[in-house]
Curated annotation (Swiss-Prot):
Protein name per the record: Potassium/chloride cotransporter 3
Role played: Probable potassium/chloride cotransporter that functions in the amphid sheath glial cells to regulate thermotaxis behavior. By maintaining chloride homeostasis, negatively regulates guanylate cyclase gcy-8 in the thermosensory AFD neurons and thereby controls the microvilli receptive ending morphology of the AFD neurons and thermotaxis. Modulates the temperature-evoked neuronal activity of the AFD neurons such as calcium responses to temperature gradients. Might also play a role in the chemotaxis behavior mediated by the sensory neurons AWA and AWC.
Keyword Hydrolase listed: no
GO molecular function: potassium:chloride symporter activity
Topology of the protein relative to the lipid bilayer: Multi-pass membrane protein
Annotated GO CC locations: apical plasma membrane; plasma membrane; synapse
Localization annotation: Cell membrane
Residues spanning the membrane: 92-112, 114-134, 142-162, 174-194, 196-216, 228-248, 251-271, 400-420, 433-453, 473-493, 534-554, 557-577, 600-620, 791-811, 827-847
Cited InterPro entries: AA-permease/SLC12A_dom, SLC12_C, SLC12A_fam
Length: 1070
């Protein structure tokens, strides 16, 4: 075979839309398996082999296995999958999404409230009301389609979508609200069904008889009957649900068929009434509609239904002695009110007429019903109070937004398809098509019915919520054809089926939330029975549903129900907005007819409906969400679901960092950005209290609201898996310890070994942080002198910190520092030895802002050798300076007296010199010693520069020099000749004798200062001292520098050494 004809591969085109592989056999379609391989393929199912074809991409055996980029993608992880697998998911768009969603959306509210909404708002404003409600659900459906096609939707439906996209906190909060929405919806459906039974099917069942149903007060007999029978029906339906979900599923198609027939009967009735011009009649005095029971009372005392007597009814629409007694009985009584006179006058002066209640669809009626006529409670017509025992009056006041709140539950139910994702053959196609189609269909049905009612029923009858004028018959049922029972029975069955569905789905939703283990209090509800039924969840659902039933009225329950659904819908829209605006890499929805502005409009509409309907209830819903959010955050939501809130946080952080300029801040804006260096002994069996105490101190310094990073040094290598596992455990411990001391910040670990200490520390200081958010303050602990590793680390941390121009804070006696819960009183003493820009005072001030140190008093001891004649002037100048700094502190000037070198000092200095020589000899005798790099390359000690910036706080190094007080420059000064040798390093050209004298002088300073501090601060809670500039010569650091500091702090319990870089200038400016 020639090279030109030789083939090295075969290519198969994949139809991604149909999830089928197109073979070469004449267009034959091959079924594709779950892993993307044809189901009947019997060969090697691996894409790569250990030898040959893709050996280039085969990983070394020593390297941990990584996922191939062509491996299967699964979202979410295995632990997030449903516990039960369906044998076969074969439902399509129609049976799996479209019809169930329509069945859930269309309900009792459409039959018992839509006509009344039209009567109050008019056709035009009802169109606007429906537009707002339907548009909010349509936009939410679009957002839902985008989110649902951006991955696999598991059990939990809407809760799964929200929690996996907004995080555990928001997911739990909105999940609980969605659970409450389903539970309270069950209450509304049950109360609506009871209303249909008692008002329109069997009024004789009412306790107190049919007449008791006329008492429409909140705690009147009508609503008490609804509460009682609602509780009975709730228990019956709970028993049915406890028997299993299969029975509930059997009722769904029956309920849907009855609803469809009822809608068709309404439309048929509008047409039939227009053709025949026959229908039920009503009586009215002028335009005041009368209750039919009053009109029929003289002849049919106990009759409440008269469908077969429409012809004779108009004969009863005439004034009679009985009607006169109803309207004018109290006129002649002494207890007669002004209203009684008005009722009687209207009755006697106006004509009583018989009107056709259902003239059939016509433009005249439509025009008459076009504009709103909102009414207050007990009004018979707008602005006129009616006689409640005789006329048809309103049982509650109405406004546009109140009507919107009542009707909004009629458009909910769009998550039905999402909840059935596990039963769908192709969820990513079925959910968008089915949900949006169902939303558009139901919206069209509502518009058609609203126009039908507005054009087929007179205005006065439309306002008759309970059908009092037509023999307590449902208004929509009286319009229908061929028989009112089609609508009445259909309305009841729709409520019964919908309530069963809610009682079935709500406990399972609660179980999904509890199973995620983000709300500990819900843990018991994760358990199920042997038949996989969440019995405990059902019990809680019944209890909450009973609370909803106790509200009594459908309208009251609907107003509460809105907010649960609206919060859920708003967050689904926000998910889509969040992912789109942040351009998340994993945001690749298959649903293409989506734009984030639509989702933003949907979220805005949801919040608008909430706050327009009821500001108090909206605030309660938002507060409930916030409370659950903070509860989950407080309990520690340890789930990581790759949610969008993390993406939002990252984007916000990026934006903020870019706004912060990467340069030194103005002195007014300086605050400690703390890097806490920990060299503790990390062990699972032992807790090193030094690390916890360091974190405690770091938390107490966070009054400056700066950055905090805790870094633990570990001896090891990044190449060792054992060391990496240990580092991960240490970081976990560190995070827990930071949380326990309430230090909010970041934790990290750093490996080092004996040959990398210098580069490790230097690299850490140079690289840590990002942009303008970099640590400027290093907090480190005095090392354990018996641990050589800690000594070497400490030396490098100090030297490189100084070279990097960081503020250094060194703690001594860290285990004696107070814990978070302690409250100290006493003194915080600042021993001001060198001019440092005021960093000691700033650190002390920040510590005092914390509740641990708040009870302490600041004292400043300025050490000086000024003569007594100038001491008072210096004290006055310093007092003014402290006052202008706005720091409350007591100021003391300390004059050192005895300057003689004692024998003790000479002995200690000689000891330091002897140790120095021993270590030098040891260093020379060992090649490749750990600290070979302590010297410069030329073998000479590194020259040490003063760390205190000349521009910020300069002083003369010559003995006897004095600096002046200049308050305009916020300077304080005092004689520093005494400490020149102590607070600076020696020069490289000093001979041994000069070095010995220098050591004696430094040791003398340490001893003298220690005695003075112990004399003046014997009981201080904390002492702050200037940190002498460290030598860059490591041998000098280990041999003498640490010894001086040890002597300086001898017998002092808590000490902070603070060394400024000169940038931390505390100013008197505002």
């Amino acid at each position: 075979m020639s090279n030109a004809r030789r083939r090295f591969s075969t290519v198969t085109q994949i139809n991604t839309e149909g999830l089928q592989a197109m073979g070469k056999g004449g267009g034959r379609m091959e079924t594709v398996g779950e892993d993307g391989i044809p189901a009947d393929y019997k060969g090697n199912r691996k894409f790569t082999t250990s030898l040959g074809h893709l050996a280039l991409y085969k990983e070394d055996e020593g390297i941990g296995t990584q996922a191939s980029f062509i491996s299967g993608y699964t979202t979410p992880g295995p632990k997030e999958r449903a516990t039960s697998e369906h044998v076969k998911a074969n439902l399509g768009v129609m049976l799996g999404v479209y019809l169930p969603t329509i069945q859930h959306i269309l309900g009792v509210t459409m039959f018992i409230r839509l006509f009344w909404v039209v009567g109050m708002s008019g056709v035009a404003w009802t169109m606007a009301l429906l537009a707002i409600c339907c548009l909010s659900t349509l936009l939410t459906s679009i957002s839902l389609s985008a989110v649902a096609t951006n991955g696999v939707v598991e059990s939990g439906g809407a809760y799964f979508i929200i929690s996996r996209n907004l995080g555990a906190e928001f997911g739990s909060a909105v999940g609980i609200l969605f659970y409450l929405a389903n539970t309270v919806a069950a209450s509304m459906y049950i109360v609506g069904g009871v209303e249909v039974i008692l008002m329109y099917l069997w009024p004789e069942m009412a306790i107190g008889g049919a007449d008791a149903l006329h008492d429409t007060e909140m705690f009147g007999s009508l609503y008490n009957n609804l509460r009682l029978y609602g509780t009975v029906f709730l228990l019956i339906q709970a028993l049915i649900v406890a028997m299993g979900v299969k029975f509930v599923q059997l009722l769904a198609p029956v309920s849907l068929m009855c609803v469809i027939l009822a809608i068709a009967a309404c439309i048929g009735g509008g047409i039939e009434k227009q053709i025949t011009m026959e229908g039920m009649k009503v009586c009215a005095i002028d335009n005041h509609l009368l209750q039919s029971s009053i009109v029929t009372h003289p002849i049919h005392k106990n009759q409440t239904s008269w469908f077969n007597e429409t012809v004779d009814f108009c004969n009863l629409c005439d004034k009679s002695l009985y009607l006169e007694s109803v309207f004018c009985a109290n006129v002649n009584n002494d207890e007669a009110s002004a209203e009684d006179d008005v009722f009687c006058t209207h009755y006697t002066s106006k004509k009583m007429t018989c009107q056709l209640a259902f003239p059939g669809f016509n433009m005249k009626t439509l025009n008459d019903n076009m504009w709103p006529e909102y009414m207050e409670k007990s009004e018979v017509v707008p602005g006129v109070r009616g006689k409640e025992t005789a006329e048809v009056v309103q049982d509650e006041s109405s406004t546009f937004f109140m009507l919107m709140a009542i009707y909004f539950p009629a458009v909910t139910g769009i998550f039905t398809g999402t909840n059935m994702s596990g039963d769908l053959r192709d969820p990513q196609r079925s959910i968008p098509v089915g949900t949006i189609a169902a939303t558009l269909t139901t919206s069209a049905i509502y518009y058609i019915l609203a126009i039908l009612f507005g054009g087929s029923i007179t205005r006065s009858v439309l306002r008759d919520k309970f059908g009092r004028s037509i023999g307590n018959t449902m208004v929509v049922a009286a319009l229908s054809w061929p028989h009112p029972a089609v609508v009445t029975v259909g309305a009841f069955l729709s409520t019964f089926g919908a309530a069963l569905q809610c009682l079935c789905s709500a406990p399972r939703l609660l179980q999904s939330i509890a199973k995620d283990d983000v709300i500990p209090i819900l843990a018991p509800f994760a358990r199920v029975t042997k038949n996989n039924e969440p019995f405990l969840g059902l019990v809680l659902t019944v209890i909450i549903a009973e609370c909803g039933i106790l509200l009594g009225a459908v309208d009251k329950i609907a107003e509460v129900l809105d907010f649960f659904f609206l919060m859920c819908y708003a967050f689904v829209n926000l998910i889509a907005v969040l992912h789109s605006v942040l351009k998340s890499p994993n945001w690749r929805p298959r649903f293409k007819y989506f734009h984030w502005t639509l989702s933003l409009l949907g979220a805005a509409l949801c919040f608008f409906i909430m706050f327009a309907s009821s500001v108090p209830l909206a605030c309660i819903a938002c507060t409930a969400t916030a409370v659950i959010y903070k509860y989950v955050e407080w309990k520690g939501a340890k789930k990581e679901w790759g949610d969008g809130m993390r993406g939002l946080a990252l984007t916000t952080a990026q934006y903020s960092l870019l706004k912060v300029e990467d340069k030194d801040p103005h002195p007014k804006n300086w605050r400690p950005q703390v890097l806490i260096l920990l060299t503790s002994q990390w062990s699972k069996e032992m807790i090193d209290r030094r690390a916890v105490s360091m974190l405690n101190l770091g938390a107490q310094l966070k009054a400056g609201r700066g950055l905090a990073i805790a870094c633990a040094f570990l001896k090891g290598s990044v190449d060792s898996q054992k060391d990496k596992n240990r580092a991960r455990d240490v970081k976990t411990t560190l995070v827990k310890d930071m949380s326990s001391v309430r230090l909010r910040g970041f934790a990290k670990t750093m490996f080092y070994n004996n040959h990398q200490i210098n580069g490790t520390i230097s690299g850490l200081y140079q690289s840590i942080g990002i942009g303008g958010l970099r640590p400027n303050t290093i907090l480190l602990n005095w090392p354990n002198e018996k641990n050589p590793d800690e000594l070497v680390l400490f030396a490098e941390e100090i030297i490189h910190g100084a070279a990097n121009d960081n503020c250094l804070i060194v703690t001594k006696g860290i285990t004696d520092f107070p814990e978070y819960s302690e409250r100290l009183t006493g003194f915080i003493d600042i021993w001001w030895i060198v001019q440092d820009g005021g960093i000691l005072m700033l650190i002390a001030y920040l510590l005092r802002q914390h509740k641990v140190w708040k009870g302490c008093t600041l004292r400043i001891f300025a050490v000086s050798e000024q003569d007594s004649t100038k001491s008072e002037d210096m004290k006055a100048g310093l007092q003014k300076y402290i006052y202008m700094l706005r720091i409350d502190a007591e100021l003391f000037i300390v004059d050192l007296l005895d300057m003689e070198v004692s024998d003790e000092v000479v002995e200690k200095a000689a000891e330091v010199e002897r140790k120095q020589k021993e270590r030098e000899e040891m260093r020379r005798s060992k090649s490749g010693y750990l600290n070979d790099g302590f010297m410069e390359d030329n073998g000479k000690p590194r020259q040490v520069m003063m760390r205190h910036s000349d521009s910020a706080r300069s002083f003369s190094p010559q003995p006897g020099a004095h600096t002046s007080i200049n308050l305009d420059e916020t300077e304080t000064s005092f004689t520093e000749s005494l400490f020149d040798d102590f607070y600076r390093s020696g020069t490289p050209n000093e001979d041994l004798e000069g070095a010995m004298k220098l050591n004696i002088h430094k040791m003398n300073t340490s001893v003298r200062l220690n005695r003075v501090i112990r004399e003046n601060s014997p009981d201080s809670q904390l002492i702050l001292l200037n940190l002498p500039s460290p030598p860059r010569n490591r041998l000098a650091f280990n041999n003498s520098y640490m010894t001086y500091l040890d002597v300086l702090t001898e017998d002092l319990p808590r000490v902070l050494f603070i060394g400024g870089s000169g940038r931390e200038v505390i100013t008197i400016d505002s």
